[in-house]
Amino acid sequence: MIKSIPSISSEVDEEKIFKIINENFSQLAPAYYTLVTHWLINAYKVHKGIDKFIILIYLINKDFIFYRKNGLIVDYDTFYKDKSLEIPKINISDIAKDLLIPKENVRRKISELEEKGIIKRRGKKIFIERSGFIQSKTNVTLNDFSILVSKFSEVLKDKKITDKSFDTEEISKSIKENFSFCWYQFYKFIFIFTNSWKAGTKTQDLETICVGLIVLINTVQNRNFKNKN
């Protein structure tokens, strides 16, 4: 329950935040690229194909969208409590368009997920088995994500945008409590990120892009790395 009315003047200025990110990206880059690279590697490990996993989380994200539309916040433990997750009707054309994956590839990968028992149909309902998006992989991403947000909170404090910074444990706890909202935002980022790489490099091969990111992360973790902008 809100105990006091929020001040309109306290609204976050997105342009100012983006400017701070751009000007201080060298401080955020190691944590940022670690998050992305670990996610892509783990996505590949689950189904031996990054696109297949992205299609899976695209379907899962439909539930997160449903929660948002209905003003619901589902915490981490509740979300992972059941063995399966009901999802809306699968639309091949929408998936292909939104993820920049050819329709035939989408159709084939969904068929493979059904053959493995990850996607199951029970009458008119469709379910995803939890084994398809292993919880341990989420724990890795949660930790990496928390480190990045914690680092960014330090930057914001240094620039006097906020009064305090938050450690990784505080961030992780908050994400778990607001899991459906936070993971909706994270998945939205993943879709934008992978689509931009596909469009920018004109390749559908996210595995090759992942190799390039590993090289990049070795660069940004170098102590001599500087922001050239």
Model features per residue range: what roles?
Residues 134-166, 170-174:
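Short, amphipathic alpha-helical interaction segments positioned at domain boundaries
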Residues 100-115:
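Short amphipathic alpha-helical interaction segments
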Residues 114-124:
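A short, conserved structural fragment
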Residues 1-53, 158-202, 206-209, 213:
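N-terminal leader segment of winged-helix/HTH proteins
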